[in-house]
Structures are given as C-alpha cells and as structure tokens.
Amino acid sequence: MQKHYHKLISYLCDFLEKETQKRGFKKVVYGLSGGLDSAVVGVLSQKVFKENAHALLMPSLVSMPESKSDALDLCETFSIPYTEYSIAPYDAIFCSYFKDASLTRKGNFCSRLRMAFLYDYSLKSNSLVIGTSNKSERMLGYGTLFGDLACAINPIGELFKTEVYELAQHLNIPKKILDKPPSADLFVGQSDEKDLGYPYSVIDPLLKDIEALFRTKPIHLETLTQLGYDETLVKNTISRIQKNAFKLELPTIAKRFDPK
C-alpha cells in the first residue's frame, strides 16, 4: 500500500507539472480552506512548484475560526506562500441586499466569490488555477457550478474522498485536518455527512460500483440493491447523480443556423 501511494504521489505531481506547462504557465494558485482536499492539493502543488505555488485563504462571515488556523498551520508546516483575502465584507453586502436568501444561496455566492478572487489573482500573477474537488463530490454534484468546481486542472478529481484521506496520510497532512469532519464551511454547522445523509465511508463503495457497472449505460436500482446496498442510500445517490450531472458538462452551444 505504501508503494502504491508513493507511485500515486509521483503520478499526480507529474500531472501537475506537465498540464501546467502545456498551458504555458509556470505558477499555480488554489484556494486553501483548511480542509482535507485543498490541503492535499496544496502539498502536491508545493512539491512541484515550490514558491511558485500560491494559496489564497478566503474566509467568509461564517467560516469557522479553526478553518483559517488550520490553513495557516499547513502553510507554515510545508512552507506554502499564501495571501489572505477576507470575503466577509462582500458576504455582508449580499446578506444585506437579500435578507431572505437561503443558506444555499449564501453559500453559493461565497463559493463563486472565492473563484472570482482566484481568477483575478491568476490574471494578476500569470498563474494557473488548480481545482480541489474530489471524485465523490463531482459524481454527486456536491459543489457549486462556476464556484469551487471551476478550475483549469484538478489533480484529485478522479480520487474518491476516502482515497484522498488515505493519500493525505501519506503526505503527512496534520492530524487535526485529517480528523475534522468534512465540511464546505459555507454556513454554521454544515457538514458533508449532514448534507449527503451518509458518511463517505458508506457512499464511496457505492459510487465505485456505479462507475464500474454503469459507466456507459443507465443505472439500475435493482442491480445495486442486490449487491447489498441499502435501497434508500441507492435511491438518494442515483437521484443526486442524475440531477447534478449537468455540472460536469460544458455549456451546450446551439449549432450554427443554416437558412437554406
């Protein structure tokens, strides 16, 4: 297992280096939240680009204090250059304009605001934006379109959350980041498990079987329940995948009109 992850780390570092060079960049930038996924991307990026890998810390009005402190500790431990841009003032303006906005609207606004800061920094510093969404999130559509899902390249987009966790252990990510419950930190009390209804340890095996069995054909509930999965889990997961599939697609462009 140790050898497998040594090869995976080498593969992902090679991916980052080649794909960044292919696009004509020498520097990268990414959002560092204090969570597991961005910590893994941050350490991988630092391995490849050293001081040319820059992290942006972008706390909102409702970001947990430990999110920022964990991100800062990671930067210190791995010598990661960073800049902090508080999005709290913009968050406050949105909330003052839209007093009845749901938690989802507020969270999506903050997610897209962070991506705006990342792409502004990208332009200013000629850096490529690196994504931090894992495969579990991508399959379930558990992310904000043109927010945290937006990026130029993503080294962990084909790793399920449980695989990212194992990779993080081999990268020596601090224990307090490893141990904290996964959360997008978009509103007080949020956690991935509360939003999704199940922990990733339960969801990921199902997602792996769905990908293996139904990559090119419709998903069948009966096939999955026969494998021993709980019917409610399967129904909820299939619903999320189908409902949010559009988030992984490029915009559909109308074909050129021919008046003849």
Curated annotation (Swiss-Prot):
<dbReference type="GO" id="GO:0004359">
    <property type="term" value="F:glutaminase activity"/>
</dbReference>
<dbReference type="GO" id="GO:0008795">
    <property type="term" value="F:NAD+ synthase activity"/>
</dbReference>
<dbReference type="Pfam" id="PF02540">
    <property type="entry name" value="NAD_synthase"/>
</dbReference>
<feature type="binding site">
    <location>
        <position position="183"/>
    </location>
    <ligand>
        <name>ATP</name>
    </ligand>
</feature>
<dbReference type="InterPro" id="IPR003694">
    <property type="entry name" value="NAD_synthase"/>
</dbReference>
<comment type="function">
    <text>Catalyzes the ATP-dependent amidation of deamido-NAD to form NAD. Uses ammonia as a nitrogen source.</text>
</comment>
<dbReference type="InterPro" id="IPR014729">
    <property type="entry name" value="Rossmann-like_a/b/a_fold"/>
</dbReference>
<keyword id="KW-0436">Ligase</keyword>
<feature type="binding site">
    <location>
        <begin position="31"/>
        <end position="38"/>
    </location>
    <ligand>
        <name>ATP</name>
    </ligand>
</feature>
<feature type="binding site">
    <location>
        <position position="112"/>
    </location>
    <ligand>
        <name>deamido-NAD(+)</name>
    </ligand>
</feature>
<keyword id="KW-0067">ATP-binding</keyword>
<comment type="subunit">
    <text>Homodimer.</text>
</comment>
<protein>
    <recommendedName>
        <fullName>NH(3)-dependent NAD(+) synthetase</fullName>
        <ecNumber>6.3.1.5</ecNumber>
    </recommendedName>
</protein>
<keyword id="KW-0479">Metal-binding</keyword>
<feature type="binding site">
    <location>
        <position position="137"/>
    </location>
    <ligand>
        <name>Mg(2+)</name>
    </ligand>
</feature>
<dbReference type="InterPro" id="IPR022926">
    <property type="entry name" value="NH(3)-dep_NAD(+)_synth"/>
</dbReference>
<dbReference type="GO" id="GO:0009435">
    <property type="term" value="P:NAD biosynthetic process"/>
</dbReference>
<comment type="similarity">
    <text>Belongs to the NAD synthetase family.</text>
</comment>
<keyword id="KW-0520">NAD</keyword>
<dbReference type="GO" id="GO:0003952">
    <property type="term" value="F:NAD+ synthase (glutamine-hydrolyzing) activity"/>
</dbReference>
<keyword id="KW-0460">Magnesium</keyword>
<dbReference type="GO" id="GO:0005524">
    <property type="term" value="F:ATP binding"/>
</dbReference>
<dbReference type="InterPro" id="IPR022310">
    <property type="entry name" value="NAD/GMP_synthase"/>
</dbReference>
<dbReference type="GO" id="GO:0005737">
    <property type="term" value="C:cytoplasm"/>
</dbReference>
<feature type="binding site">
    <location>
        <position position="132"/>
    </location>
    <ligand>
        <name>ATP</name>
    </ligand>
</feature>
<feature type="binding site">
    <location>
        <position position="37"/>
    </location>
    <ligand>
        <name>Mg(2+)</name>
    </ligand>
</feature>
<keyword id="KW-0547">Nucleotide-binding</keyword>
<dbReference type="GO" id="GO:0046872">
    <property type="term" value="F:metal ion binding"/>
</dbReference>
<feature type="binding site">
    <location>
        <position position="161"/>
    </location>
    <ligand>
        <name>ATP</name>
    </ligand>
</feature>
<comment type="pathway">
    <text>Cofactor biosynthesis; NAD(+) biosynthesis; NAD(+) from deamido-NAD(+) (ammonia route): step 1/1.</text>
</comment>
